[in-house]
Amino acid sequence: MSNREPSWRDGVLFGVLGMLGFSGTLVATRVAVHDFSPLAITSGRIVIAAVLAAMTLVILGKTKLPERRLLPGLISMGLGLAIGYPFFLALALEQVPAVHGAVVTGLAPAATAIIAVLRTGERPPLGFWIACAIGFSAVLFFAIDAGGGHLSLADGWLFLALLSLGWAYVEGGRVSAELGGTTALSWAMLFLAPFAAVPFVWSMTDVSLATVAWSSWAGFVYAGVVSMFLASVFWYRGLAAGGIARIGQINLLLPLAALLWSALLLGEEITTTAVVCAVVVFAAMVVCLKSRVRT
């Protein structure tokens, strides 16, 4: 049987698998915070992912340390993806349902694009900024409506999670261009693992393992195995096979998929406001990414 070059169809397949894996993060975190603290979830994700990363690097034969000049980018990628995003997300989901988080985090493509613009000096057209403003306004309206007329602390945590994720994607994209997505992710997790091990052990001392619900364990393991590692591996492979411009659009479906999982798995109510705002954000993010100028 001859080897076949990956096609754009492979890119779509892996991209969809990655997106679906990411979309379960909100539900998994919402369930896990019932028995685990945000610190335990965040540090535990890193420890689990680091074990998988070490195995992956050995299998791929990528055990040689990256060049020193790439370390700042790898560490920045890890800090945003493995610490900032999950920690702030867990803090938020202690207070609001996963549906709320799904709508707000729908702004992730805009956050990523804006950070990339600031980092690269791009000059996007007016349509880019208008689309971002519309998406932000829709999320702001939803958050104020859900908060009874005002923003909540959870909304602040969610916006910090967005900034962390956007920063991680931008920095990760820079180092992934040289190392490859899976290799970059693996080294980022390994570099952070020693710093995550102690907080993880310490945070678990307050957990009564015998009373932890199976659903909390499932959410905790999902966050480490799927959200932190496998989904990223599928996603980066999809980008490599199908191209960033084409496959990257698949992630726009993530908040809509997260809404669906929230209703199906948690039984959360999806209000008309949530659906309308999610659709507006989705449309705005499509325009945002389509109008962005690449340099």
Residue ranges and their predicted role:
Residues 1-43, 91, 147-174, 195:
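Glycine-/small-residue-enriched transmembrane alpha-helix faces in small-molecule transporters
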Residues 11, 35-84, 111-115, 164-171, ...:
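Transmembrane alpha-helices of multi-pass small-molecule transport proteins
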Residues 20-21, 25-26, 54-105, 141, ...:
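Specific transmembrane alpha-helical segments of multi-pass solute transporters/efflux pumps
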Residues 27-35, 91-94, 140-153, 201-220, ...:
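Membrane-interface helix termini and inter-helical loops of multi-pass transporters
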Residues 32, 41, 45, 92, ...:
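Hydrophobic/aromatic residues within transmembrane alpha-helices
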Residues 42-44, 82, 86, 100-107, ...:
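Helix-helix packing/entry segments at the starts of transmembrane helices
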Residues 52-65, 89, 108-130, 256-276:
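C-terminal transmembrane-helix exit sites in multi-pass transporters
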Residues 53, 75, 115, 124-144, ...:
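Hydrophobic transmembrane alpha-helices of multi-pass small-molecule transport proteins
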